[in-house]
């Protein structure tokens, strides 16, 4: 008899999809590029943000796409994107709320990805990898769709690092016998806290060329000038 397929509770998955949809629409509504997005464009970005993480997660795990197994996923993502568009003006003035929303979305998708990978029998390291990909996948697709540089590839407040820390906490906790649900909650909290602190205190990984400068300075006693 085949082992039962691990299923994330529908309400939990839809919560992540909805929050991601709102966050994507808020981002797209505030976009000020050479070509402004119309209502359809903003809605598409919201849907991509809401559903992207789950799609990437299930593709990596070679599982049926959860987002295509129910009408509720697309409906939730679309409705959330519309809410994000309608409330874009008031919510953009609440920067702390947007940062918190972003942190929770990353944490949820990371926790769901890692939990599902562990439940399907993946070892710790691959499970954490799946979780991180699920956490940042929506943001990557958003940037690709909007023709922007992929944010996680550039210097900025900790994003993938926060997701990795939360996913690792989840995986290690479960390894030591903590129930998967409790471990997932801990993972979401860790991811959200690190992400918020990174934004508040402007924390980021060092730039590669800064490491080069320090190495040369240590070896020669001089500070090289590196042109951008």
Show which residues each predicted segment covers:
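Loop-to-transmembrane alpha-helix initiation sites
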Residues: 13-14, 70-74, 123-129, 155-163, ...
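Helix-coil boundary and interhelical linker segments in multi-pass alpha-helical membrane proteins
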Residues: 1-10, 59-68, 113-126, 171-183
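Cytoplasmic-side transmembrane-helix entry/capping segments in multi-pass membrane proteins
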Residues: 37-46, 69-75, 95-106, 130, ...
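Structural signature of hydrophobic alpha-helical transmembrane segments
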Residues: 6-18, 65-79, 123-136
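N-terminal topogenic module of multi-pass integral membrane proteins
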Residues: 1-51, 55-61
């Amino acid at each position: 008899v085949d082992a039962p397929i691990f299923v994330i509770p529908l309400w939990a998955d839809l919560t992540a999809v909805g929050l991601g949809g709102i966050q994507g629409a808020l981002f797209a509504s505030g976009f000020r590029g050479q070509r402004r997005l119309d209502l359809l464009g903003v809605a598409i970005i919201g849907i991509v943000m809401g559903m992207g993480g789950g799609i990437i997660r299930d593709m990596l795990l070679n599982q049926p796409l959860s987002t295509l197994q129910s009408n509720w996923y697309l409906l939730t993502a679309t409705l959330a994107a519309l809410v994000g568009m309608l409330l874009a003006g008031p919510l953009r003035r609440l920067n702390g709320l947007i940062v918190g929303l972003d942190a929770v979305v990353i944490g949820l998708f990371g926790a769901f990805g890692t939990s599902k990978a562990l439940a399907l029998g993946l070892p710790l390291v691959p499970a954490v990898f799946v979780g991180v990909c699920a956490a940042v996948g929506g943001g990557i697709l958003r940037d690709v769709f909007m023709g922007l540089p992929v944010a996680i590839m550039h210097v900025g407040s900790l994003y993938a690092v926060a997701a990795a820390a939360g996913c690792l906490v989840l995986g290690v906790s479960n390894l030591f016998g903590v129930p998967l649900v409790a471990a997932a909650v801990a993972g979401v909290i860790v991811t959200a806290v690190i992400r918020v602190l990174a934004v508040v205190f402007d924390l980021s990984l060092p730039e590669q060329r800064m490491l080069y400068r320090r190495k040369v300075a240590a070896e020669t006693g001089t500070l090289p000038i590196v042109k951008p």
